[in-house]
Amino acid sequence: MYDKSRSNKVYGGYEKAPNRAFLKAMGLTDDDISKPLVGVAVAWNEAGPCNIHLLGLSQVVKEGIRELGGTPRTFTAPVLIDGIAMGSESMKYSLVSREVIANTVELTVNGHGYDGFVALGGCDKTQPGLMMSMARLNIPSVYMYGGTTLPGNFRGRDIAIGDVYEAVGAFSAGKITAEDLRIMEDNAIPGPGACGGLYTANTMAMLSEALGLSLPGSSAPPAVSSDRTKFAKETGRTLMKVMEIGLKPRDILTFEAFENGIALLMASGGSTNGVLHLLAIAHEAGVSLTLDDFDRISKKVPEIVNMKPGGDYVMADLYRVGGTPVILKKLLDRGLLHGDTITVTGKTMAQNLSEYKIPEFKHDHIVRDLSNPFLPSGGIRILKGSLAPEGSVVKLSASKIKYHRGPARVFNSEEEAFETVLKKKINEGDVVVIRYEGPKGGPGMREMLAVTSAIVGQGLGEKVALVTDGRFSGATRGLMVGHVAPEAAVGGPIALIRDGDTIVIDGEKGRLDVELSDQELKSRAKDWTPPEPRYKTGLLAQYAKLVTSSARGAVLV
């Protein structure tokens, strides 16, 4: 039996005849209204390719819902395309959109009394925003990813969008021609779907499987594949099954499920944004998760995946060898995954993986065995020290160097740093420090992809490091340390750094320090005054007042 108590409160009984009249105006019958009314939350717009196909997929999801006796109602959630906003003031709205998406789903689902919902996402912040709404509302719900784009092509080799960002730096350094840059621009994204490498979108899709919120194997199929369509229908059917047994997101999102997510994040070398978003989803689920949990698991889970930006392959390649379950099964077999966590199938993680058919051909060029990893520890490390007492995050899998000691070059905004990099005024050995770009200071904690890609494109990726209280795109590579907390806007040590101060990044020891005495830092702190808020009205001003530290997931309180 389905629980219709939520929709009955809005549409049931003679006194709700006016409410039902609105549904009948759209062609619904008494029989339709008597069934579970379920939402299909689609993060859709025409701003970019990541989500352009999701309305079509939502129709297939609705077919699956109808097959098992539900009445689906589609609604949209806002989308901000990070790749388009990147490197501009618009990027300040990116992380903000995560919270807006979660709020939008809550508003629509609770405002219309839906009995459950499917969440369908594509671009970077749509996915954590939707998963946060699932955890917050805690009614039967299932997540589905819209799929990745296929690899692009440049003179016969596969490329992804990260290659275009780096090409901007290469062009500014005279290493490629304007024609090369144009060809890459024209061919990097060949059609619908999210960015092809193991950037934030694909990272979050994989994590949805590890958490148990989406169907096994559903994260890897490209947007244009027939498997994507099959998963759409099965996702709709799965929602009705979940509703029948009364399974809710918080039954799935246990502490052990988040440990599974962290283990996959470390083994895959996924986006550092995965840290921020897992913390935020856990917050909504009422699960106590900290950076120490990431640090602990990172030390015992090797990185075994060879995907861009640190590696060679894209999500479509992982799909061909079996998808995310290939990685999860290796972790389970080694005892690095909790097999008893429940998932949206109603079965445990171990049961799902035992039933999933993995192609029987060689795949160690993309996914290695744990006995022969690409890195002996996780692809992401948590760094703490005098420059980041609460913590910071670095993606070691995307850097050939793990240690750097050098003089600080301090900038108070991304724009200042980017202009200096393009003018080739950054020297080998420098540590570029970009501050006042944190959750409160930006506000919005922008991703520094334009700057990091320009550094790499100029050939300085192994000779220069970067430290920021902002974030990084999943496409970032090089020794780039982000999420520095406390941030500059609240007087964190990063606010006290001056040009020429020596900064030490030690990825293997998990340290981020500035070579200054405690006495000197305290002296500088006395002279520091908080900057005026950059925004006095509007959404960004509201966000800056409510947002917490990146060490807590930059959630709102």
UniProtKB/Swiss-Prot annotation:
Where along the chain is Mg(2+) bound? Answer: 82, 124-125, 447
Q: What pathway does the UniProt record associate with this protein?
A: Amino-acid biosynthesis; L-isoleucine biosynthesis; L-isoleucine from 2-oxobutanoate: step 3/4; Amino-acid biosynthesis; L-valine biosynthesis; L-valine from pyruvate: step 3/4
- What does the record's cofactor remark say about binding? Binds 1 [2Fe-2S] cluster per subunit. This cluster acts as a Lewis acid cofactor.
The reply to whether Iron figures as a keyword in the UniProt entry is yes
Residues annotated to bind [2Fe-2S] cluster: 50, 123, 195
- Provide the function of this protein: Functions in the biosynthesis of branched-chain amino acids. Catalyzes the dehydration of (2R,3R)-2,3-dihydroxy-3-methylpentanoate (2,3-dihydroxy-3-methylvalerate) into 2-oxo-3-methylpentanoate (2-oxo-3-methylvalerate) and of (2R)-2,3-dihydroxy-3-methylbutanoate (2,3-dihydroxyisovalerate) into 2-oxo-3-methylbutanoate (2-oxoisovalerate), the penultimate precursor to L-isoleucine and L-valine, respectively.
| NCBIfam families linked to this entry | ilvD (TIGR00110), PRK00911.1 (NF002068)
Q: What is this protein called?
A: Dihydroxy-acid dehydratase
Q: What is the lineage of its organism?
A: Archaea, Thermoproteota, Thermoprotei, Sulfolobales, Sulfolobaceae
Q: Which gene encodes it?
A: ilvD
